[in-house]
Amino acid sequence: MSIKSDKWIRRMSEEFGMIDPFEPNQIKEADGQRIISYGTSSYGYDIRCANEFKIFTNINSTIVDPKNFDPKNFVTVEDDCCIIPPNSFALARTVEYFRIPRNVLTVCLGKSTYARCGIIVNVTPFEPEWEGYVTLEFSNTTPLPAKIYAGEGVAQVLFFESDEVCETSYKDRNGKYMGQTGVTLPKA
């Protein structure tokens, strides 16, 4: 299994729609202002956060149960940024839609810009033949409110191509998060 380069990421995105919309370069500035970078890097792709957020709330004092998740645990926000309360959590989705080839697995790591502020980004691997918008999980580990910027980079996806095609893909298993179109809450 080997990590894939910028040339491979460009080819797969331009010819096969692996990432849409796709940015072939690393973007570090918009409207004359520095931003948290996104786009193609040497051996990965920096994904952006869309402006759709779900922020945890304790208004309803329900229990967080991954097998029986109550949507009232979240407040929905659509904005240029999201303020995550201290020691709290939010969900968002990527700007980019992904179509992962059958012989590829990805690993996604949060950007150090956010990690250095105490904001942890978690994303599970994109499995072979999974497709959809990626649901992003943000944890604010600080005792202060924390800001996430829509339209800017939040994490880097690394692509690994297997030496052998898998016997059963995510699509073959009818994975429960296949074809996500927005922020997707937990499913059991």
UniProtKB/Swiss-Prot annotation:
GO biological process: what's one of them?
dUMP biosynthetic process
The molecular function GO annotations come to: dCTP deaminase activity; nucleotide binding
Q: In which pathway does it act?
A: Pyrimidine metabolism; dUMP biosynthesis; dUMP from dCTP (dUTP route): step 1/2
Task: Kindly state which reaction or reactions the protein catalyses.
Answer: dCTP + H2O + H(+) = dUTP + NH4(+)
Q: Which Pfam families match?
A: DCD
For this entry, the protein name equals dCTP deaminase
The protein's UniProt keywords, in alphabetical order, are: Hydrolase, Nucleotide metabolism, Nucleotide-binding
Q: What is its EC number?
A: 3.5.4.13
According to its UniProt entry, what is the function of this protein? Answer: Catalyzes the deamination of dCTP to dUTP.
